């Protein structure tokens, strides 16, 4: 399964790169190089903190990318864990497959607003009280940090979303509510989209509400 999943995700990254080259070849990406460096620096710091501080870091855990295993990983902080007793009682203690159909809540935070408010020093960056004001107060205080989207997203498969989402969702259980940080190349990459600049790390709150269709492992020898 891992081999097939790696092949699928690698293909998805290639497709994203192909689309970016064909749709955005008139864009001067040198205009975004400083922004790219800022996003890389933040990811480097977060990975360093997580590695050295473990559960004392604000983002306490990472997920190794199947598509880019040697690069920066997605990071996450558990807001609310799944209720293990209830999940076991209804025999749904599983995580999605790449082909599963899901329902979820998510909040996407504006990358530039987050960047402007992230602390510079290590102690503040890993202080939950300080960091929570960036990611939680914003839902009620638009002047602190305006959430870009608050959406109940349903009836989609892992394969239909950005690579970072696909990889994170396959580690979540129903009821898990996480704050996640996704490196730009596992998000919208160099191309960006209509509302996200190129080279933008993305920050989400993600809650897996249900797995409406479990799907299954990608078959070996599928040719993908």
Where in the sequence are the language-model features?
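Cross-family detector of peptidyl-prolyl cis-trans isomerase
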Residues: 5, 21-224
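Sec-dependent bacterial lipoprotein signal peptides
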Residues: 1-21
